[in-house]
Amino acid sequence: MLSYIKRKLSESDSGVSSVATVTSSCGGDSGRAGGTGSSESGTGSSSASISGRSQNADELVRKTSQMSMDDEAIAFGEDALLHELGYKNQTELQETIYDLLRGIRDPEKPCTLEDLNVVYEDGIFVMPPTRSNVSVVRIEFNPTVPHCSLATLIGLCIRVKVERGLPHNIKLDIYIKKGAHQTEEEINKQINDKERIAAAMENPNLRDLVENCIKDEE
């Protein structure tokens, strides 16, 4: 950013120098008629203007450097979007999501998904935002066996838990770890299809299963 500011101000200074040169040239015969005094005066005025702008540039760079060194660093792009959502950086968002996932209970066993290594911190990825500037998070999970019949239910539990747990809009992509399930492609489509998700949650039996898996421990 500092180099950008210097460059823009340098361009501005070049513009001033060009104007001064053109003005001096346009003076033509009248400038010569008036002697060298007016020419020297014009040159001195131009030099003073450029010097003033140079000092302003240095001051702006100094202030910007100081702001960057403060605790509240200047944020750009994806980091700025995360700041708007209340996170210092990607790591804080990843940790927040993992705290939601770690307590989800397995549909069959008396364990959490964290206990079984179905979910893990390295499986949470903050992706570039959408064109409409919505944050995107990808969650990867690893079923305990390649033929796990409850993989779709687990994916649904992950989605519902995170969407309810975060107080802001986010695009959530959930995928089975590559090669971890025999029908991973079909399951990935199901757990990322809004219509299928809505239909599944309208089923009272399936909804009860999800609620039991994601409810907080008392």
UniProtKB/Swiss-Prot annotation:
What GO biological process terms are annotated to this protein in UniProt? cell division; nuclear chromosome segregation; protein maturation
Residue list for modification Phosphoserine: 14, 65
For this protein, the record's InterPro entries field holds: FSCA_dom_sf (IPR034904), MIP18 (IPR039796), MIP18-like (IPR002744)
Consequence of gene loss (knockout): Mutant flies show temperature-sensitive lethality. Prior to cellularization many embryos display signs of incomplete chromosome segregation during mitotic divisions likely due to defective organization of spindle microtubules.
Q: Locations of Low complexity compositional bias?
A: 12-27, 38-54
List the biased-composition ranges (Gly residues): 28-37
Question: Gene3D superfamilies, alphabetically?
Answer: 6.10.250.1280, Fe-S cluster assembly (FSCA)
Region of interest (Disordered), residue spans? 1-59
Its family? Answer: Belongs to the MIP18 family.
Q: Any remaining note in the record?
A: The name 'galla' means splitting in Korean and is derived from its role in chromosome segregation.
> Which named protein is this?
MIP18 family protein galla-1
